[in-house]
Amino acid sequence: MNSIWKQYIDILQGVVKPALGCTEPICAAYAASVATQMLGSKPETIDVFVSDNLYKNSMGVFVPRTGRVGLAIAAATGAIGGNPDAGLEVLAKITEEEVDEAQKLIDNGCVVVQRETTDEFIYCRVIAKNAVHNAEVTISGGHTLIIEKRLDDNVIFTLDSSLPKTSTASICDGVDITISSIYDFATQAEFDDIKFILEAKELNIALAQEGLNNPYGLEVGRTYQKNIEKGLLAKSLDSDILIYTSAASDARMGGATLPAMSNYGSGNQGIAATIPVVKMADFFNADDEKLARAFIMSHLGAIYIKSHYPPLSAFCGNAVTSAAASMAMVYLAGGTFEQSCSAIQNTISDTSGMICDGAKSTCAMKVGSSAQSAMKSALLALNDHCVTKQGVIADDVEKTIKNIGRMITTGMPNIDHEIIEIMAS
């Protein structure tokens, strides 16, 4: 395997991984669990300091196994019963008794959450105290990327700046990567080297089934399924994509106790990169090798596009994740590389105005809408229709990606600020 392809695999394995619960509150749960481990006993007080974007994405989403929303319950349960060795699955084995104990801490005013001014989009600092010690853990740049630990105000760990970058914001820095090189890697790599990505199907389809079998959030997936059964809607590949992606997000945002295979720190974006591709593969009876190659396009393509702008912003990441999924769907349908590029152009043209106003139950509607856009855009591309030189869409897919990055990075910070202030008021 050439060295560049090895870098691609490292990227995928670095930011496509299982996550239980929305990753922003889970970040606080993880930091609190590590702080408690440092204390050696359960804390009496917990102070949580987070960036505005982490705050925004934690306000309205359920924390798994708690039946509650927000950073306070996430941090408290992480401290009381979280497993610091489990990363994004820190709350996988939380019990009802531990949730009750965590809630008592909150009810007694012992858990305080504050916004902190920082240039980092993903930032969480937790200070946990007992009668003897205080422990401080700082996460910055990635949901589990600890950059510093302090015990009794003494620094006991600082991240070595010479180590390879592992944050979502920097994951593609210095890597020779383009849509064309991703396509070549996906279609030419040895199957044994990429088959690990198939776990995404197992996890995210299981999450979709959970969302269809049980009432979570707005029940977007279940509602569409019921209306097909009533005859109001027709069953089709398009409806299957909408139902399964929405149902998975329903469960994800509703606090289901199943992990999602995340993408770039987001479970919903992992769903968007996975389920439409699975449904397209099922339609064409694609084998595991073909599906794995399509997953490389959707997951690595999404990571590459999103590396052009901050990991948390006023822009809904499902919009461009679905563009990469559309690329993969064209491949599964037997389309050309040029048609795959057209699918990306078409999807971004359709979804580029979708804002992020926090993680919550309505994400299921956005995930479903983005997935349907991926399908629509793939069909247009397969019929040689491509949006070009219109609005932010350039005459070349790489230029379009740069335009989107510019729009979000320089054009949307004020929008993000206003969204957060509206939500906090």
Curated annotation (Swiss-Prot):
<dbReference type="GO" id="GO:0080146">
    <property type="term" value="F:L-cysteine desulfhydrase activity"/>
</dbReference>
<comment type="similarity">
    <text>Belongs to the UPF0597 family.</text>
</comment>
<dbReference type="GO" id="GO:0019450">
    <property type="term" value="P:L-cysteine catabolic process to pyruvate"/>
</dbReference>
<dbReference type="InterPro" id="IPR005130">
    <property type="entry name" value="Ser_deHydtase-like_asu"/>
</dbReference>
<dbReference type="InterPro" id="IPR021144">
    <property type="entry name" value="UPF0597"/>
</dbReference>
<dbReference type="Pfam" id="PF03313">
    <property type="entry name" value="SDH_alpha"/>
</dbReference>
<protein>
    <recommendedName>
        <fullName>UPF0597 protein VF_0641</fullName>
    </recommendedName>
</protein>
